[in-house]
Amino acid sequence: MPNPYFSFKQFTVYHDRCAMKVGTDGVLLGAWADVVSARNILDIGTGTGLISLMMAQRCNARIRAVDIDADAVEQARGNVAASPWQDRIEVELQDICHFTSETLFDVIVSNPPYFTDSLKCPGKQRNIARHTDFLDFDKLAGSAARLLHPEGVFSVIIPADGKESFLMAATRYGLHLSHQTFIHTKPGSEPKRVLLAFKFSVDKCVIDDLTIELSRHVYSEEYIALTKEFYLNM
């Protein structure tokens, strides 16, 4: 039977009620996203609450986390309640397309649905979590642009082959790429994921790569440096 939780250095995430379990994508985004000077953070499609918890560990901002799946929201609330940062994270059952806030957000993060063109997997929950039928790139970019502070940053992790589609969507709403990191599972491999950061105004775009493993269970120095504050054995 799969373990119902995943333990990090400062918090534990239960994921037995969530369609999408704790995985590398969420950890990468939670560790990579720029939170310098952040005061208000929005986590779109929070799932287990993992990324919100990582944001809370990294900075002192107030965080609002939203998801459209009721089971995920309840589980995320439980994970937040058991963490050291329950007073700074609010988890809400919300469709981001209808979400409103009196405050614009310095940082917006999302590990959005993907596999647009693949066959749907069994189960409505997992389809919501993994397919862009429920939140396509255009709606996500539009919602982020509507809620982002003029000086803020919007960060996502998506499949590498979806990058151009996401860039087109972001550009339609005045968002410009400020940082791009291709993720390679091993040296020389084609990137499977890409981390993207957007701002309304950009002087230059930083483009780099990150390799996770040098060989089986031998992690790169860059990956260790990025995630060592979270993973127990890093």
UniProtKB/Swiss-Prot annotation:
Reactions mediated catalytically: adenosine(37) in tRNA1(Val) + S-adenosyl-L-methionine = N(6)-methyladenosine(37) in tRNA1(Val) + S-adenosyl-L-homocysteine + H(+)
Any single Gene Ontology cellular-component annotation: cytoplasm
Biological-process GO terms, alphabetical: methylation; tRNA processing
Keyword S-adenosyl-L-methionine set for record: yes
Localisation per UniProt entry: Cytoplasm
EC number: 2.1.1.223
PROSITE patterns: N6_MTASE
Family: Belongs to the methyltransferase superfamily. tRNA (adenine-N(6)-)-methyltransferase family.
Protein name per UniProt: tRNA1(Val) (adenine(37)-N6)-methyltransferase
Organism name: Phocaeicola vulgatus (strain ATCC 8482 / DSM 1447 / JCM 5826 / CCUG 4940 / NBRC 14291 / NCTC 11154)
